[in-house]
Amino acid sequence: MNKETIKQAVAPYMAELTQMADRIYDLAEPGLEEVRSSAILTDYLGKKGFQIERGIADLPTAFRAVYEQGNGGPSFGFLAEYDALKGIGHACGHHMQGPSVILSLIHI
């Protein structure tokens, strides 16, 4: 797969996922308080057919999103952070991780 093919494949999702990243950036919720950021990500994944399990490891804003294809193929996982730094905001770039992971998931 070449660079141009990838650009064409992701183009339909770029506006909404960029908007998602911007919303998470604006919220700038610190660790363990990213309630709205978590909801943005899980709502989107739920609409794409993922089963959502919230409160993973007794962390209220942590979640697992599972997409079953039923073909017995391999399983894999992705990790995204979406917390901000207190008083600084998203200087860490975590606002981009969730939307980037979602883009990867859509294309697997």
Where are these regions (language model features)?
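Acidic/His- and Gly-rich active-site-bordering loop/insert found
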Residues: 2-103
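Conserved small/polar residues in nucleotide/adenosyl-binding loops
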Residues: 106-108
